[in-house]
Amino acid sequence: MERAAKKEAVEQLNETFRTTGVAIVAHYSGLTVAQMQTLRKQMKQAGASVKVSKNRLAKIALEGTDVVAIGSLLKGPTVIATSSDPVAAPKVAVEFAKTNENFVVLGGSMGKTVLDVNGVKALASLPSLDELRGKLVGLLVAPATKIAQLSTAPAAKLARVVQAYASKDEAA
């Protein structure tokens, strides 16, 4: 790899690390190309990305970012999964590790908070931002729906009573 290409790779990685919400590091030794493609596809569907780069270049790119703590995990054949959603990358990584024994999650970082394997698993068990937003909207809409039902209920009852009297008079 030429010096200019290395510099470009470091700049791209640095940009990724500066804008990410979470970074997960895992060993991928022994994965087939098809398995790596599956991992990349699953990460992309979840809104995350996977990077495989030279550890030395990744450590240089980590300098000056919030996720600098993951530099100590970069030993051997490592892959770095990143996402702006703090739950997306950990969730996919942990699920992928369950089905592929050659993929081993080492740890990660959420902002300046360092995560060990258990921290990554705990983060993966949380609901995603979209799920939380859906629940919040549901909680906000529910009272308005109940108020609307309560305000229309007396009028509906009155209409049914009038209808009952009208049908009673017609029958008589």
Curated annotation (Swiss-Prot):
Highest rank taxon of the organism: Bacteria
Q: Which UniProt keywords apply?
A: Ribonucleoprotein, Ribosomal protein, RNA-binding, rRNA-binding
Q: Name one GO cellular component term.
A: large ribosomal subunit
- GO MF annotations for this entry? large ribosomal subunit rRNA binding; structural constituent of ribosome
The answer to whether keyword Ribosomal protein applies is yes
Which biological process, per GO, is one annotated for this protein?
translation
Family according to the record: Belongs to the universal ribosomal protein uL10 family.
What exactly does this protein do? Forms part of the ribosomal stalk, playing a central role in the interaction of the ribosome with GTP-bound translation factors.
On subunit structure and binding partners, the annotation says:
Part of the ribosomal stalk of the 50S ribosomal subunit. The N-terminus interacts with L11 and the large rRNA to form the base of the stalk. The C-terminus forms an elongated spine to which L12 dimers bind in a sequential fashion forming a multimeric L10(L12)X complex.
PANTHER family hit by this protein: 39S RIBOSOMAL PROTEIN L10, MITOCHONDRIAL
Q: What is this protein called?
A: Large ribosomal subunit protein uL10
Identify the species of origin: Nitrobacter winogradskyi (strain ATCC 25391 / DSM 10237 / CIP 104748 / NCIMB 11846 / Nb-255)
Protein's gene = rplJ
